[in-house]
A protein has these predicted regions:
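Extracellular leucine-rich repeat
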Residues: 2-425
Length: 425
């Protein structure tokens, strides 16, 4: 009877291990893709190891909580390894030493907090390192030193504190072209944090608790940068005309969802390659008359969700503007023949979004006639008769004077309130 019980226990154990083990399939004799078993799993040698033909391994969401030594032994052709969306809390020193041809390593969305110094010493060909969505709060000086070929680094959505980062952390990785710090606290980071970079193109600082444009993001060595993302921070003003003077190659500047109220009229002047500026969801009441003037490559400006009451054609004069968004401001009128004047002053306007705003009906009528006549795309779906889009007095003509603005804005807010109440009644 004891033998029977022992046999049953062994069978149950074997069955449990089999149930926990991810199921793997090989495609084209070189790409291994695994799916999760029914319980959490400790990765050990034998599941994906010992195959010199394997070039790619995907262990995404396989409920892996730990990786044992030799799990990746004898994978001399492996270049792609995806361990994302697991439950890994730490990586032991030496655990990824074997696949020396590795160029892509995805460790995103695990529970990592830090790395032992030397972890990457043997994978010197890494080109892409994805660490987003972990709990990393510390980067040991020297951790990236072996990664001289690193090109893409994603550190977003971790627990990094910029003021605690060593400014020499990337000194041996000068060829990084993409780095993402978004959803970390980067306020107070060292001014020379990125001083080693020689060819950075994209820097993402979204949701980084920044109160101003950080100086580490605008240094002279970053003249190669094409995209600078500063959205969803606490930047309140752009008053220094020299802020972006070093960023000659910049094509996209995203300042969405800050608290910007004032902008120096010359702040964008050095950006001769700028194509798109996103300033939506700030609190600007006015914009300088020459803010976007004579910018030879500027084609898109988004000013949605500010508090603008007046926007002059002069703001864009001499720029080849194609797309303009003025929706959700406090605009009751635009100057007569606004779109035609844009085109006559160098613009190539093709798409113009201007609703909702507290329009005077006569002014909106003139604008709609103009965009239709010129074949300009606009948000026509807003004009379905289901909600108020403008207000008028008995005198139906467009009053293009600022002193009338408050009256029409108040009227529009009253009409919206009445409409809201009637729908909820």
């Amino acid at each position: 009877m004891m033998v029977t019980y022992t046999t049953v226990a062994v069978l149950i154990t074997i069955f449990a291990i089999a149930e926990a083990k991810p199921k793997c399939k090989t495609f084209s004799q070189k790409d291994v893709v695994c799916t999760a078993g029914k319980t959490d799993y400790q990765l050990v040698r034998g599941l994906v190891s010992d195959n010199n033909k394997t070039t790619g391994i995907t262990l995404r969401a396989c409920r892996i909580y730990d990786i044992e030594y030799e799990s990746f032994n004898d994978l001399n052709s492996l270049s792609y390894l995806d361990l994302s969306q697991n439950k890994i809390q730490n990586l032991k020193l030496g655990v990824i030493d074997e696949p020396k041809q590795l160029s892509y390593l995805n460790l995103s969305y695990n529970q990592l907090t830090e790395f032992p110094l030397g972890l990457f010493d043997q994978v010197t060909k890494l080109d892409l390192l994805d660490l987003r969505g972990n709990k990393i709060n510390k980067l040991e000086l020297g951790i990236f030193d072996p990664l001289t070929k690193l090109n893409f680094v994603d550190l977003s959505s971790n627990a990094l504190v910029g003021k605690d980062l060593n400014p020499y952390i990337f000194d041996q990785s000068p060829h990084i072209t993409f780095i993402d710090f978004s959803r970390n606290n980067m306020e107070g980071s060292p001014d020379n944090l990125l001083h080693a970079f020689q060819s950075l193109q994209i820097l993402n600082l979204d949701r980084c608790f920044l109160k101003e444009v950080p100086s580490f993001a605008t240094k002279p060595n970053l003249g190669t940068m094409k995209h600078l993302i500063l959205s969803t921070n606490q930047i309140s003003k752009l008053d220094n005309p020299a802020t972006f003077v070093n960023l000659d190659s910049l094509e996209l500047l995203d300042l969405t969802a800050n608290v910007i109220e004032t902008i120096n009229p010359n702040i964008f002047s050095p950006l001769k390659n700028l194509q798109k500026v996103d300033l939506k969801n700030n609190i600007m009441k006015t914009i300088p008359d020459d803010l976007f003037r004579n910018m030879p490559k500027l084609i898109s400006v988004d000013l949605y969700g500010n508090q603008l009451e007046e926007v002059s054609v002069n703001v864009f004069r001499g720029s080849p503007l194609k797309n303009l968004n003025l929706s959700s401001n406090r605009i009751t009128y635009l100057q007569d023949n606004f779109c035609l004047e844009l085109r006559n002053s160098g613009g190539k306007i093709k798409k113009f979004l201007f609703d909702p705003n507290p329009w005077q009906c006569a002014c909106l009528h003139d604008l709609l006639k103009e965009v239709k006549r010129l074949g300009i795309e606009y948000n026509k779906g807003k004009y379905d008769g289901k909600r108020p889009v403008c207000v008028t007095t008995a005198e139906f003509n467009c009053k293009r004077q600022q002193n009338f603005n408050e009256m029409y804005i108040d009227m529009f807010n009253d009409v919206k309130e009445i409409h809201r109440n009637s729908r909820s009644a």
